[in-house]
Amino acid sequence: MRTNPLTTVRNLGILAHVDAGKTTVTERILYLTGTTHKRGEVHDGTTVTDFDPQERDRGITIFAAAVSCAWAGHRINLIDTPGHVDFADEVERSLRVLDGAVAVFDAVAGVEPQSESVWRQADRHGVPRIAFVNKMDRAGADLDAAVASIRERLHPVPLVVQLPIGTEDGFTGVVDLPRMRALVWADGADAAEEGPVPGTLREEAARRRRVLEEAVAERHPGALEEFCDRETLTAATLTGALRDLTRTGDGVVVLCGSAYRNRGVEPLLDAVVAYLPSPLDVPPVRGTHDGAERERPADPAAPMAALAFKVNATPTGRLTYLRVYSGTIGKGDTVWDAGTRRTERIGRILRVRADRHDPLERAVAGDIVAVVGLKTARAGSTLCAPGAPLLLEPPGVAEPVVHVAVEARRSTETDRLAAALARLTEEDPSLALRTDPETAQTVLSGMGELHLEVAVERVRREYGLEVTVGRPGVAYRETVGEGVTGFVHRHVKQDGGAGQFAHIVLDVEPWEQDADGDGAGGGFVFRSTVVGGRVPQEYVRAVEAGCRDALAEGPLGGHPVTGLRVTLTDGRTHVKDSSDTAFRTAGRFGLRDALRASGMILLEPVVEVTVTVPEDGVGGVLGDLAARRGRVTGSDPRGGAVVVTATVPLAELFGYATRLRSRTQGRGTFTARPTGYAQAPAAVVR
């Protein structure tokens, strides 16, 4: 059983834009907690959490890695998540099982595009956060500017609890504002030396503590009462109020440091323990059974319920990562998969330390562990006690937007390639496989060019297969331009047996989701305005099913159709020959023909790119973006460089990283994030 009480457990993720220092923060946490005995470095390829060869080669996090460590009597289950937009689904699956998060920001760049994306993902899941402004030792580092960008672009209430001591390369420590004590790190030291606030900073520290007190009192009734009585807050009251505001999402505690130089990570760990919630501090997990909503408390004695959020299908077996929400799960237990409605048997239970594992006899509510022995569980599967079924909501999976054709170089290895790709899609639900009906090629789809590069490289490295990869393509969509009214379709079939008869009249019109949807091309709505029972309800449902069948391939290029509303306005039946099958067929072919008359529009995926380039390279970058049909939306000077933002069709970005390096002599970088779909020009349609 657990040695830590549930109140001392923290399940948290490290979130950030790529290169903000997430993995370095994680490595310092592991080192300071005694989990590792050497500081892992991203640039040396010696990190614990980025243990995959590609992660070490590329210097970025690709796969969410779970680690467990201890600090100040607390068990911390930590997940280091990817920062690149192509792996946003890894972040989504991780956030689904976390109780809190540390958002890491670059002290020079502040909020970056993927910072916004992961922050909003955390908002959707209601995950409380604290912020860590990293790289305070860099030239141009500015805590106040970083906090301002957090406030302006992410819209939380930042509650800054530290004052930096020194600037840029002279950054040596912080003033802890709640306790009004200085923490200073000597070069190479693992621990800080604590002392009084330096005389040169006392006035500024007092002013900032006053600002912090006022911000907290304004939002916390208990703190307000003490502040009105005493005109100040004790350290205990301030800490307690900060904890409450963090857990309710009414404030975000902000700390700062330099993880690379080991400065500021100890206070960050203290803040994780002090401010982020335990499994008991978050609402009980909710699920459904037989259509009724049920709750499960974070109680080891309650019926067991767990969610699988990650699968590693290694050549030696499957590792399934679980968040246990309630109850206890033991080695050898039989569990119920609520999705497949099958029983599975738990083999080994492992405490995870990235690529190393410690065996456990059991796991209890609040634990994040890996188990061996599950054969059918996937990311998003609910496992529960057989006698107390419960289905938890799985993490969402985004639709792939880029695809490549993949073939084995040797025809004798086609079956091995199919098995390898199937194993990859088993691990990563954001990858999809299909066979092109015209070419019979295997097509692998994913979230971006890098996502697919990583998948193909895994096939080569892990399975020893030589593969040929086609040019990337994007996932186009088709939508309705003008629409059509009163379109009549009649389905009649007489072949000697039972006849088929269905007569329908359809209106087809463009439709967009609300503001919180994805705008143009935002889905499909079906309705019926038939009166007088001219088409029975069961046939109406069949027409809707047929219409949904027709959406799979549009008339422009066989792309999925979206962004339309179809209304069944009239119809006729035959006393003998009408059936569900007849009306479903009429719906499918009727809508297919109606779309041909509806002035269809081709939609292409569009991304927002953020290019950081030296000032002398801006002209070339702007010209290149224009040639790629890009629309520049902003250009901001930043510390000797210029940050250019633009919206660009995804299809035009293939190979852009190489082109940018060439134009800027290797000094330019860019990131991209999906923003939806937009109408493609006539040249693309042709």
From Swiss-Prot:
Record's function text: Catalyzes the GTP-dependent ribosomal translocation step during translation elongation. During this step, the ribosome changes from the pre-translocational (PRE) to the post-translocational (POST) state as the newly formed A-site-bound peptidyl-tRNA and P-site-bound deacylated tRNA move to the P and E sites, respectively. Catalyzes the coordinated movement of the two tRNA molecules, the mRNA and conformational changes in the ribosome.
Extent of the signal sequence: none
Organism: Streptomyces coelicolor (strain ATCC BAA-471 / A3(2) / M145)
Molecular function GO labels: GTP binding; GTPase activity; translation elongation factor activity
Residues binding GTP, per UniProt: 16-23, 80-84, 134-137
Pfam families referenced in this protein's UniProt entry, alphabetically: EFG_C, EFG_III, EFG_IV, GTP_EFTU, GTP_EFTU_D2
The name this protein goes by in its record: Elongation factor G 2
Location of this chain's protein in the cell: Cytoplasm
KW Cell inner membrane (keyword) present: no
Chief place where the protein resides: cytoplasm
Gene3D superfamilies per UniProt: 3.30.230.10, 3.30.70.240, Elongation Factor G (Translational Gtpase), domain 3, P-loop containing nucleotide triphosphate hydrolases, Translation factors
InterPro entries in UniProt: EFG_II (IPR041095), EFG_III (IPR009022), EFG_III/V (IPR035647), EFG_V (IPR035649), EFG_V-like (IPR000640), EFTu-like_2 (IPR004161), G_TR_CS (IPR031157), P-loop_NTPase (IPR027417)
Boundaries of every tr-type G domain copy: 7-280
Alphabetical UniProt keywords: Cytoplasm, Elongation factor, GTP-binding, Nucleotide-binding, Protein biosynthesis
An example Gene Ontology CC term for this record: cytoplasm
GO biological process: ribosome disassembly
CDD domains membership: EF-G, EFG_III, EFG_mtEFG_C, EFG_mtEFG_II
Protein family per UniProt: Belongs to the TRAFAC class translation factor GTPase superfamily. Classic translation factor GTPase family. EF-G/EF-2 subfamily.
Keyword Acyltransferase: no
